[in-house]
């Protein structure tokens, strides 16, 4: 079964957007994954196609109605084991581990909120998993949904050129990725570290592991504190050859 993402949104014209180019776009055109963007307004029942109303208890903005959104969700032929997600800054942070789980499944149903948010009752009644891509607020969930989908698509079989491309990246073993270099050998007086040109695979692996650990300690102490030490060490010892990697 082809991995498929179904997006419920007020702006289906935003899709595929950036998902239609580069790795994700080529894979989409090749049938390695599928994408469906559905307009939430199609589930509205009044002549104005209303989808929102004022917040109960007062306050600014508008809230997406539970009845309309529930109808939109129910109109999707979703398998019982298909994840139902809603992009929300109050959700659990999206991690590479969760991305891998989603990529290994049938593909998610993703609800994109707008306005002041979504009526909590539909989140509870339809078992929506709230997911956040960071501690900031966007105008809607569409861009966040694209980020989640792109992260998943890269892990699907046949999408990446080399299996090692995804296993060496940031977060794959609890570390940020080590620095990458390519030609020219010297750029504005800055040379490629000699160890990367040595041909000694063991030294290259040790250097990369050391750089990844140093970057993680400095920039993401939370990741460093939670890292699986044995897994990281094994990863460093198993790395073989230098490589170049692009997503474009």
From Swiss-Prot:
What is catalysed by this protein?
Answer: guanosine(37) in tRNA + S-adenosyl-L-methionine = N(1)-methylguanosine(37) in tRNA + S-adenosyl-L-homocysteine + H(+)
> Basic and acidic residues bias: where?
234-248
Record EC number: 2.1.1.228
Q: Does the keyword Transferase apply?
A: yes
Q: What is its main location?
A: cytoplasm
Q: What class of enzyme is it?
A: transferase
Please list the GO biological process terms of this entry: tRNA N1-guanine methylation
Where, by residue number, does S-adenosyl-L-methionine bind? 113, 133-138
Q: Does the keyword Zinc apply?
A: no
Q: Where in the cell is it found?
A: Cytoplasm
Which stretches of sequence are listed as region Disordered?
227-248
Where is it found, in Gene Ontology cellular component terms?
cytosol
What function is annotated for this protein?
Specifically methylates guanosine-37 in various tRNAs.
HAMAP family assigned to the protein according to its UniProt record, in alphabetical order: TrmD
Family that this chain belongs to: Belongs to the RNA methyltransferase TrmD family.
Name it: tRNA (guanine-N(1)-)-methyltransferase
Q: Identify the taxonomic lineage of the organism of origin.
A: Bacteria, Pseudomonadati, Pseudomonadota, Alphaproteobacteria, Hyphomicrobiales
Originating gene: trmD
């Amino acid at each position: 079964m082809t991995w498929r993402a179904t997006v419920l949104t007020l702006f289906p014209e935003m899709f595929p957007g950036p998902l239609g180019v580069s790795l994700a776009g080529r894979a989409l055109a090749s049938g390695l994954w599928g994408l469906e963007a559905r307009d939430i307004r199609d589930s509205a029942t009044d002549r104005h196609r209303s989808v929102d109303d004022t917040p109960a208890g007062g306050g600014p903005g508008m809230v997406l109605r539970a009845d309309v959104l529930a109808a939109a969700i129910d109109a999707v032929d979703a398998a019982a084991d298909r994840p139902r997600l809603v992009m929300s800054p109050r959700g659990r942070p999206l991690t590479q581990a969760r991305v891998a789980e989603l990529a290994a499944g049938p593909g998610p149903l993703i609800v994109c909120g707008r306005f002041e948010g979504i009526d909590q009752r539909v989140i509870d009644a339809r078992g929506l998993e709230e997911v956040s891509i960071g501690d900031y607020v966007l105008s809607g969930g569409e861009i966040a949904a694209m980020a989640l989908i792109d992260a998943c698509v890269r892990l699907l079989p046949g999408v990446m050129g080399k299996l090692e491309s995804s296993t060496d990246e940031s977060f794959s073993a609890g570390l940020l990725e080590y620095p990458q270099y390519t030609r020219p050998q010297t750029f504005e007086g800055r040379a490629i570290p000699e160890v990367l040109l040595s041909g000694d695979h063991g030294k290259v692996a040790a250097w990369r592991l050391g750089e990844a650990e140093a970057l993680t300690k400095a920039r993401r102490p939370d990741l460093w504190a939670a890292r699986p030490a044995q897994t990281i060490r094994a990863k460093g010892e198993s790395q073989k050859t230098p490589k170049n990697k692009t997503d474009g």
